[in-house]
């Protein structure tokens, strides 16, 4: 049996919407938001009415009768740490998102928009595998200093979707497989997935793991400490050096990997060095996650937008294919992943979780 489900993915400069009937897309649309449109809003919460109007306009433009919907699902935002799965949107969840209790991001609006429409239609609303999915084994939380605990913040939605898809192609259940999955995008997260749980993963947001097109990843602590007290940068500027202006931007002045590849193919030495170093760091993290799984790795999966780059993935494959087979699952279809999670719950294949 298939169900009509609206999926909502609010991003920092776009709102992505799609209606599915089972796994069939009835329509999909991405609405881009200019900086001028968003300039009047002081924070993400102030954008709610603006995004709501976008949602209603898109539904009306496609002539879809919202009364046919059987569920609405939004991108999960910054919440308290939770296990992976599909969650019913509750008032407690909405309160935490409205208060930005665990951080501010455009994805915080996903559950809020989903619940508003679902409540009007008296149907359920959900989120699926938010970025705060935390399934880390206890030993992985220990950082090396008692005042700091390692946190799980990663591209959980795409990790889980890629893991389930590859497991299905292999004729297995994701919950019975051991994978090392690397999401390669503006941020990079590499996780050890043991029997359906991400038991260790780098914090892809706060300065941990490989550097990426715009994030610094792990840095030598003493040098960064010196920078903090040098008086050269404010706290906000230092944070931007970690997230937003780190990684490739700091080395080459761009976060466009198309531009970086063009420089590499033109033989620019600095570009080749940075490009190779990023692939090296990703490969090293994959190796570390293979140790977490004690070498029992069914496959290494490379996913995300950068997985489309044959030049980049080939460098990772060269350094890791001695561990196990490397499978490329490029891109990240977050709307499809949101829909799949809800379809499984509505069909009774999974039970929804409560926040």
From Swiss-Prot:
Family matches, as SUPFAM superfamilies: Actin-like ATPase domain
Annotated GO CC locations: cytoplasm
Gene Ontology molecular function terms on file: acetate kinase activity; ATP binding; butyrate kinase activity
Main EC class the enzyme belongs to: transferase
Any Gene Ontology biological process: acetate metabolic process
This protein's record includes keyword Ribosomal protein: no
The protein's Enzyme Commission number: 2.7.2.7
PROSITE patterns: ACETATE_KINASE_1 (PS01075), ACETATE_KINASE_2 (PS01076)
Reaction catalysis annotation: butanoate + ATP = butanoyl phosphate + ADP
Annotated keywords: ATP-binding, Cytoplasm, Kinase, Nucleotide-binding, Transferase
Top-level taxon: Bacteria
InterPro entries from the UniProt entry: Aliphatic_acid_kin_short-chain, Aliphatic_acid_kinase_CS, ATPase_NBD, Butyrate_kin
Similarity annotation: Belongs to the acetokinase family.
Protein name, UniProt field: Probable butyrate kinase
């Amino acid at each position: 049996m298939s169900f009509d489900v609206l999926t909502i993915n609010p991003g920092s400069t776009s709102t992505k919407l799609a209606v599915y009937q089972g796994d069939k897309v009835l329509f999909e649309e991405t609405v881009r938001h200019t900086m001028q449109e968003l300039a009047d809003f002081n924070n993400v919460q102030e954008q709610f009415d603006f995004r709501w109007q976008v949602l209603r306009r898109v539904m009306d433009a496609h002539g879809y009768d919202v009364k046919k919907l059987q569920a609405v699902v939004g991108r999960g935002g910054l919440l308290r740490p939770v296990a992976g799965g599909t969650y019913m949107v509750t008032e407690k969840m909405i309160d935490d998102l409205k208060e930005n209790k665990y951080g501010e991001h455009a994805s915080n609006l996903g559950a809020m928009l989903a619940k508003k429409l679902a409540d009007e239609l008296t149907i359920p609303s959900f989120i699926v595998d938010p970025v705060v999915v935390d399934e880390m084994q206890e030993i992985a939380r220990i950082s090396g200093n008692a005042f700091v605990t390692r946190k799980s913040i990663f591209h959980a939605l795409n990790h889980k979707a890629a893991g389930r898809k590859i497991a299905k192609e292999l004729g297995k259940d994701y919950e019975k497989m051991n994978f090392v999955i690397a999401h390669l995008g503006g941020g990079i997260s590499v996780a050890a997935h043991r029997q359906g749980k991400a038991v260790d993963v780098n914090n892809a947001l706060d300065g941990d793991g490989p550097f990426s097109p715009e994030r610094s990843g792990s840095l030598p602590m003493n040098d960064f400490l010196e920078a903090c007290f040098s008086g050269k940068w404010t706290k906000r500027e230092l944070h931007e050096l970690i997230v937003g202006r780190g990684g490739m931007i700091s080395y080459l002045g761009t976060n466009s990997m198309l531009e970086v590849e063009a420089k590499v193919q033109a033989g620019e030495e600095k570009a080749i060095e940075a490009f190779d170093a990023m692939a090296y760091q990703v490969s090293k993290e994959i190796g570390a996650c293979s140790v977490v799984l004690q070498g029992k790795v069914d496959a290494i999966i490379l996913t995300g937008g950068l997985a489309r780059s044959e030049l980049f993935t080939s460098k990772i494959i060269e350094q890791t294919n001695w561990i196990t087979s490397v499978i490329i699952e490029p891109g990240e279809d977050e709307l499809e992943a949101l829909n799949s999670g809800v379809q499984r719950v509505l069909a009774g294949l999974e039970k929804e979780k409560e926040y």
